[in-house]
Amino acid sequence: MFVSRLAASGLLLLALLAVSLDGKPVQQWSQNWPGPKVPPLVVQQWSQNWPHPQIPPLVVQNWKSPTQLQPRESPAGGTTALREELSLGPDAALDTPPAGPDVGPRGSKAAAAPQRLSKSKGASATSTASRPMRDLRTDGKQARQNWGRMLNPDHHSAPGGGGGGGGGGARRLKGLAKKRAGSGCFGLKLDRIGSMSGLGC
């Protein structure tokens, strides 16, 4: 009895789906549905021939090639005077006139004077430029001496050592230190590593 009720309700649903709200079948209702209005063929052709902006053919178009551009119209932008200076070489950047035949009575010396002047200017410029770097270096002679004193305090404390006078005790200690450093750990000879290098022997 329950199954028959289920079957009856299913059939009723199918019948309701087949009939539309007006009471007409679904196929007839879909045929009468107003679709999008398609304009006639004459109107379509007229819309395709709508006046567009006239584009001249490629032969008529007169574009400037990159070689025809003036120096001030460079496509990359920026200053072209700098590029011209760089292309001419370092002599153009220094603004020194080239030595010609009308130099004067002492042609060779007068021509060499500006070059010598520019070289001295360049040398002083490089020395002033490298001075801060020289000051920042930590491996100077004095720094190395300080490190040597810190690592080998007994080496520099000998009396009478030094350059020309005295008994040369520092040299003796230097030789002993070399021998002491030469006798290595575990029977191996150490070449440049000192006894205070932290090998633990």
Curated annotation (Swiss-Prot):
GO terms for biological process: cGMP biosynthetic process; receptor guanylyl cyclase signaling pathway; regulation of blood pressure; vasodilation. Transmembrane segments: none annotated. InterPro entries: Natr_peptide (IPR000663), Natr_peptide_CS (IPR030480). One of its GO terms (molecular function) is hormone activity. Keywords: Cleavage on pair of basic residues, Disulfide bond, Hypotensive agent, Metalloenzyme inhibitor, Metalloprotease inhibitor, Protease inhibitor, Pyrrolidone carboxylic acid, Secreted, Signal, Toxin, Vasoactive, Vasodilator. Residues 132-142 have a biased composition (Basic and acidic residues). Venom gland. Residues 120-130 have a biased composition (Low complexity). Residues 24-47, 58-60, 67-95, 107-179 form a propeptide. Residues 90-172 are annotated as: Disordered. This is Bradykinin potentiating and C-type natriuretic peptides. Residues 1-23 form the signal peptide. It comes from Sistrurus catenatus edwardsii. It is found in: Secreted. In the N-terminal section; belongs to the bradykinin-potentiating peptide family. In the central section; belongs to the bradykinin inhibitor peptide family. The keyword Disulfide bond applies. The modification Pyrrolidone carboxylic acid is found at residues 48, 61.
